[in-house]
Amino acid sequence: MSQAEIVDIPTNVITGFLGAGKSTAILHLLKHKPANERWAVLVNEFGEVGIDGELLGGNNRGEQGVFVREVAGGCMCCASGFPMQIALTSLLSEARPDRLLIEPTGLGHPKEVLAVLNADHYQSMLDLRATITLVDARKIREPRYAEH
């Protein structure tokens, strides 16, 4: 990937309600990433697991080939996605990753996040791959699972 352009970054969105295990799943993926690759993670908020602190030890961003950025200003899917766009563009520019993982809040609907990622601006930059939805099997019978 040249310094001038960012193209076709394999991108996965990891969704699920709060407590479904999104952060834990992302940590697992990051711990098994190829050593020669740079991965970026865009998170809506740092959850109980704490991807940033757990994996990166706080101040050594990028030293393990992992860059984490939090979306400031609330939900990724709110306010036309502007906070998400700002954080994503900054993360891509800084990290120049080989793969991008996105963890939206468990409170919003991922369709708004996917709409931002499918916008013209990101068409050549991102290669959207599978959207992974995690489900807490203990709560599968709750109405919200059927509604979303």
Language-model region placement:
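Nucleotide-state-sensitive switch-loop elements of NTP-binding domains
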Residues: S2-T15, A20, T24-H148
